[in-house]
A protein has these predicted regions:
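Glycine-centered flexibility motif
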Residues: 1, 58-60, 131, 135
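Aliphatic-rich helix starts adjacent to a transmembrane/signal segment
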Residues: 13-40
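Sequence-level detector for tyrosine residue identity
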Residues: 3, 43, 52, 85-87, ...
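Short, glycine/small-hydrophobic-rich surface segments
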Residues: 47-74
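Periplasmic/extracellular, small/polar-rich flexible segments of pilin-like filament-forming proteins
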Residues: 64-141
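N-terminal alpha-helical signal peptides/signal-anchor transmembrane segments
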Residues: 33-55
């Protein structure tokens, strides 16, 4: 009986153990997503600083060269009706990372049927510009 319990216990430990390669891959992915979220927050902060000095622009795209840094792959902005939309393709875990970096901002959402939904799936009552595709992750300001 004792050996049976011991074998069940050891079997459970072996079954629930995650290999070191999986842990490393998960940590790398989390680090990449966190870095992407940090870049996104910096990007929108630079846009806000730029808009403070250029209040006349209410619509269009602000070129990344205006911020003095090189473009980030798949990270875009568009101004519409004096509102900034920073958007990028969503990927698993990116919304959580962006929420963590933005201190759980209510201005982070995902585009579904041209509407912006928050992290709980609630409609934020915002129609997004035509250039933002469904499934994109948006940081609104």
């Amino acid at each position: 009986m004792v050996y049976w319990l011991l074998s069940v216990f050891i079997g459970f430990l072996v079954w629930s153990n995650i290999s070191p390669h999986d842990q490393t891959g998960t940590q790398l992915q989390d680090s990449t997503l966190s870095q992407r979220a940090i870049q996104t927050v910096r990007y929108i902060n630079n846009i806000n600083d730029w808009r403070y000095n250029n209040p006349s622009q209410k619509d269009g795209v602000i070129p990344d060269s205006a911020f003095g840094w090189s473009s980030l792959p798949a990270l875009h902005n568009v101004l519409q009706a004096d509102r900034v939309y920073v958007y990028q393709p969503d990927q698993p875990g990116l919304m959580s990372a962006l929420l963590a970096q933005s201190r759980h901002s209510a201005l982070v959402g995902k585009v579904v049927a041209r509407r912006l939904l928050d992290s709980f799936g609630n409609d934020m009552q915002v129609n997004v510009p035509d250039s933002i595709t469904d499934g994109s992750l948006v940081y609104l300001n």
